[in-house]
From Swiss-Prot:
InterPro entries: C-N_Hydrolase, C-N_Hydrolase_sf, Gln-dep_NAD_synthase, NAD/GMP_synthase, NAD_synthase, Rossmann-like_a/b/a_fold. One of its GO terms (biological process) is NAD biosynthetic process. This is Glutamine-dependent NAD(+) synthetase. L-glutamine binds at residues 115, 172, 178. The gene is nadE. Pathway: Cofactor biosynthesis; NAD(+) biosynthesis; NAD(+) from deamido-NAD(+) (L-Gln route): step 1/1. NCBIfam families: nadE (TIGR00552), PRK13981.1 (NF010588). It catalyses: deamido-NAD(+) + L-glutamine + ATP + H2O = L-glutamate + AMP + diphosphate + NAD(+) + H(+). Residues 2-242 form the CN hydrolase domain.
């Protein structure tokens, strides 16, 4: 029997000292009940450290903290696996395996992702050697994140050399539908290699990335043995009968046949550890889609605010669905006492919008201010009229209202050190239906990667918990209220159609003609994609926000601003 502890923790990029202290605390508290304690990928530096990895003094701090962890383990009879940047003639994404003040081995990540949000080739050299140790007569191998996604990679090599447990440490970002696929594929890895697979993941928000945790252990029979909580720190200890791997291999000749002609991996070190208390696997519930997305957005917002030294946020409340939903999210993430809402009516704002914004603020119990912009707008208009003479009201006059509102919000930010939340959604950001330096402005954009139709679904989910958003907000046509009788559909296709086009174009990477063949209207498709192309300059200047789809604007989307291609 082997007791494995997966330390699913929320680390902070660059806080080497704080991250080290978290690691030491877990070692102190869990060494008596564990044979192996595994921490996530690059847990010492935080993930992703990006260009901090190019600073020698940062690497020196990581090395110093690593030495302190090694020293700390001298009095504990437990194996500790810690992720860190490791310099040895070159820089590696590494995993150090330590026992009683001695490094048993350093595993260096083999497969470096360089797609989507990942840039690991920019920083790291690929590792080449596997790492397998023997614990109480059982072979245990280690790997890092991307390595396990390759069916014939290091896990296969060590399994065919007798590994009964593969410990894979991760910093795997969340997006919708990823977890179910990941769990299914990890079960396949365990069944194919006829061994236990333990997958420990990071949890928390880091800029635009969200890490969902949900560390899991799978048996050689493909059975889920243990699963940690979603979107929360969790320490998961489980007792594994590693003899299961041997029993399974005696029944399944694939392992024997697959091992012929393969280069064998030798055991790096053997360690004998005392028997420890039995722990049955705990399987935490997997959240449903709306609950999962909401938890991701909430965690991302909370971590961005707190890790960057803010306490309070301010946002404009328009009486519409986007700002209403973001206000609810902010209250749930930060507490009502830390959220300020500002309603800024113009001559085009309706009485209903004021009533809905006020009702929302009262329901949430947040501080609520009303600052009319009509006279401010008139002062702008009068000054422009002196120079331009006759002015015909058009989109420039609409946008100046949004920019006045942004100035007011940033006054609160500057005066009281509140973080301004942008309430722009993915549908608007995609097609540029947002005012640059206006409603698009902010320090963080919590729904930047949430399609408009999803905003409605998530708001309904939030109202099922507490009905704080007035029902009228769901039913009225969406409008920026920048001119009389305006609705979003004056300019855009219906959101039900628009969002389908956006998903097919952005996430599934289809061409306009391929989208049309899916049954969507030709005019709407070409209009939408032309708007996407023309508004790249806006997206380049948008605040960051959490990635929750398979392809988000930001690190995931690297289109040129100057671009003539359109087919």
């Amino acid at each position: 029997m082997l007791n494995l502890t997966l330390a699913q923790l929320n680390f902070t990029v660059g806080d080497v000292e704080g991250n080290k202290e978290k690691i030491l605390k877990v070692i102190d508290e869990y060494s008596e009940k564990s044979h192996i304690i595994a921490f996530p990928e690059l847990s010492l530096s935080g993930y992703p450290p990006e260009d901090l990895l190019l600073q020698p003094h940062f690497l020196k701090e990581c090395e110093k903290a690593f030495d302190q962890i090694i020293h700390h383990t001298r009095n504990y009879d437990v194996i500790v696996a810690v992720g860190l940047p490791y310099y040895e003639f070159d820089l590696y994404n590494a995993l150090a395996v330590i026992h009683r003040g001695e490094v048993l081995g350093i595993y260096k990540k083999h497969f470096l992702p360089n797609y989507s949000v990942f840039d690991e080739y920019r920083y790291f050299r690929k590792g080449e050697e596997p790492l397998m140790i023997e614990v109480n007569g059982h072979k245990v191998s280690f790997s890092i994140c991307e390595d396990i996604w390759y069916p014939d990679g290091v896990e296969r090599q060590t399994a065919l050399s007798g590994a009964e447990l593969i410990v894979n440490v991760n910093a795997s970002p969340y997006h919708v539908n990823k977890y179910s696929f990941k769990e299914s594929f990890l079960k396949s890895r365990a069944e194919d290699n006829l061994c236990f697979v333990a997958y420990v993941n990071l949890v928390g928000g880091q800029d635009e990335l969200v890490f969902d945790g949900r560390s899991i252990v799978i048996s050689p029979f493909g059975k889920l043995v243990a699963r940690a909580k979603a979107f929360e720190e969790d320490i998961l200890t489980v007792t594994l009968d590693l003899g299961e791997a041997k029993r399974k291999r005696l029944l399944d000749l694939r392992w024997r046949e697959g091992s012929y002609g393969r280069e064998k991996v030798n055991v790096k070190r053997s360690v004998s550890l005392p028997d420890k208390e039995f722990f049955r696997g705990r399987i935490e519930e997997n959240p449903k889609e709306e609950e999962e997305i909401y938890a991701a957005l909430k965690l991302s917002l909370r971590d961005y605010v707190r890790k960057n030294g803010f306490e309070k946020v301010v946002l404009g409340l328009s009486g519409g669905i986007d700002s209403s939903f973001v206000a609810c999210l902010a209250v749930d993430a930060l507490g009502r006492e830390n959220v300020k809402g500002v309603y800024m009516p113009s001559q085009f704002s309706s009485k209903e919008s004021y009533e809905d914004a006020k009702a929302l603020a009262q329901n949430l119990g947040i501080e609520f201010h009303v600052i009319p912009i009509k006279e401010i707008y008139r002062a702008y208009f009068n000054e422009f009229e002196k120079e331009i003479c006759e002015i015909t009201f058009d989109v420039a006059d609409e946008n100046i209202q949004a920019r006045i509102r942004a100035n007011i919000l940033f006054y609160f930010s500057n005066k009281f050190r509140y973080l301004v939340l942008s309430t722009s959604n993915k549908s608007e950001t995609a097609v540029g239906y947002t005012t640059i330096y206006g409603d698009m402005a902010g320090g963080f954009a919590p729904i930047k990667d949430v399609y408009k139709t999803w905003v409605y679904k998530l708001a309904r989910y939030r109202n099922s918990i507490s009905p704080d958003i007035p029902e009228r907000v769901f039913k009225k046509p969406p409008s920026a209220e920048l001119r009389p009788n305006q609705t979003d559909q004056d300019v855009l296709p219906p959101y039900e159609i628009l969002d389908q086009i956006l998903m097919l174009y952005i996430e599934e990477n289809l061409s306009p003609e391929e989208i049309i063949r899916k049954g969507l209207p030709r005019d709407a498709v070409y209009k939408t994609i032309n708007m996407i192309r023309k508004n790249e300059y806006k997206r380049k200047q948008a605040p960051i926000g959490p990635k929750i789809t398979s392809r988000a604007f930001g690190k995931d989307w690297r289109m040129p601003v100057t671009n003539k291609f359109f087919k």
